[in-house]
From Swiss-Prot:
Documented EC number(s): 3.2.1.67
Function of the protein: Specific in hydrolyzing the terminal glycosidic bond of polygalacturonic acid and oligogalacturonates.
Domain of life: Eukaryota
Cystines in this chain: 256-273, 403-409
Annotated source species: Emericella nidulans (strain FGSC A4 / ATCC 38163 / CBS 112.46 / NRRL 194 / M139) (Aspergillus nidulans)
Active site, UniProt feature: 254 (proton donor), 277
Name listed for the protein in its UniProt record: Exopolygalacturonase X-2
Gene transcribed to yield this protein: pgaX-2
Ranges of the PbH1 repeats in the UniProt entry: 240-261, 263-283, 294-315
Length: 449
């Protein structure tokens, strides 16, 4: 970080201390109280710990800087001042132009009912973001701590100014686009009622976190130029346990939710995903010598519209190789397992495929996977109560359930699954290494893949 920016951040923190009110000021408008939102109807695998009481007199209002200057220092100072039992109110418009490490939070509420916008300074951010080793993820701020409740009450906005990032990446694949929101070690609490707009990359990366409720979110990112707004996952979970994601609307590209390695005990319910790649397990097995685990997922009552695949499991083959893409990917060779995953009550609306099991993810041709079957074993996976329509992209094929070998999949079941093709032809399901007696698929049923 440059000298001028460092000085600016320190000055911002000092100025912010003057702007923070620990006791509510007379005449101050009443801020939105934290909503009482509970997991519903499916309950979490483990009870989410109760929060501690907040001090109603420990309230920090953040006054934005003049002329759209950097508010990072003011925001951090307020969070430090009213940490441990207080509430921070962000009810105005704020610009964040320098990185924020917020992994110190404890027993705190953050009422973000205004707007936080990240400065579109591409060159600066590429040199000054927080880096994660997993898939080159990075972000301009990182949240973490214990018993944190971040809420927007339906009005709060986090805006990533994604358009210049998408435009730049269209002509230069080396541009590293930051993720809009990252948790790293967030244990206990909730994220609710926020509008996430124009993320340069994934919208949310839930990493190394636990006992977290995410609800009533509104995600929208679309490009206004010829540059494609790609890789805009709604949520990616990684090394996280006991998370509920529910009752949200997502309009974007790529996975609506993606369960990355070591995602366990997760509920996803009541989502409406439009234009996505589905609710996906994986991709897994893309790093050699690593053991990926995904287990105990319940995915309930979600509507998938205009997606490539509604329910998707994607794992790499068993040997590392250069894969398709520009620039080419390198992946595969990892091991692990996927266990106890249920997709229940999923409505398909104009989708390419309803179900896709792909143990040859990223490969150039299928023979590569037959020679090197995936080391990620899929067991106890259930698809049930799925119906709706396809868009004809693969007509009459409605789904693909393809395993790499007879040993890499076990107890894959389908119950009451049907899809209506746009042509009116009976649905066909491409299957390989499946116990077809366990598959209640509508239409023709399984055909050879």
């Amino acid at each position: 970080m440059g000298f001028k920016r460092t000085i600016g951040l320190l000055l911002g923190i000092l100025l912010a201390l003057d702007q923070v009110s620990v006791l509510a000021q007379p005449g101050r408008p009443t801020f939105a109280k934290r909503p009482d939102i509970q997991p519903n109807p499916i309950q979490p695998y483990k009870a989410i710990p109760l929060h501690s009481r907040r001090n109603s007199h420990k309230v920090c209002y953040v006054k934005p800087s003049l002329n759209g200057g950097d508010d990072a220092g003011r925001v951090e100072a307020a969070l430090r001042r009213c940490n441990n039992g207080g509430t921070i109110v962000l009810d105005k418009e704020y610009s964040i132009c320098t990185p924020l490490d917020l992994r110190f939070l404890k027993h705190v509420d953050v009422a973000l009912t205004g707007k936080v916008e990240f400065c579109p300074e591409l060159e600066f951010w590429q040199q000054n973001v927080f880096q994660f080793h997993f898939q080159n993820a990075s972000s301009w701020w990182v949240w973490g701590g214990e018993d944190i409740h971040l809420y927007g009450a339906g009005t709060g906005v986090i805006h990533g100014n994604g358009q210049p990032w998408w435009d730049a990446a269209a002509g230069n694949s080396s541009v590293r686009r930051p993720l809009l929101f990252i948790t790293d070690g967030w244990h206990g609490g909730s994220i609710t009622g926020l509008k996430l707009r124009q993320s340069p990359n994934w919208h949310n990366f839930i990493a190394n976190s636990s006992d977290l409720l995410i609800s009533d979110m509104d995600i929208f990112s679309r490009s206004s130029s010829e540059a494609w707004a790609s890789n805009l996952d709604g949520w990616d979970t990684f090394r996280s346990d006991n998370v509920v994601i529910q009752n949200s609307v997502i309009n974007h590209d790529d996975d609506c939710v993606s369960f990355k390695p070591n995602s366990t005990n997760i509920i996803v319910q009541g989502l409406h995903c439009n234009g996505s790649h589905g609710i996906s397990v994986g991709s897994l097995g893309n790093y050699p010598y690593q053991y990926d685990i995904v287990s105990d997922l319940y995915i309930y009552n979600n509507t998938m519209a205009n997606t490539t695949t509604a329910a998707r499991l994607k794992v790499w083959p068993g040997a590392e190789a250069v894969k398709k893409g520009n620039p080419p990917w390198v992946g595969g060779g990892g091991k692990g397992y996927v266990r106890n995953v249920t997709y229940d009550l999923m409505i398909n609306d104009n989708n390419d495929l309803a179900i896709q099991i792909d143990q040859c993810y990223g490969a150039i041709n299928a023979s590569e996977c037959l020679d090197h079957p995936s080391g990620v074993i899929l067991t106890n996976v259930l698809f049930k109560n799925m119906w709706g329509t396809s868009n004809g992209a693969n007509d009459p094929v409605a789904g693909q359930l393809i395993c790499g070998s007879a040993d890499s999949c076990d107890n894959i079941r389908a119950e009451n699954v049907t899809l209506t093709n746009s042509s009116g032809q009976p649905s066909e399901w491409q299957c390989r290494y499946m116990d077809e007696e366990l598959l209640d698929l509508g239409g023709v049923g399984c055909i050879p893949a």
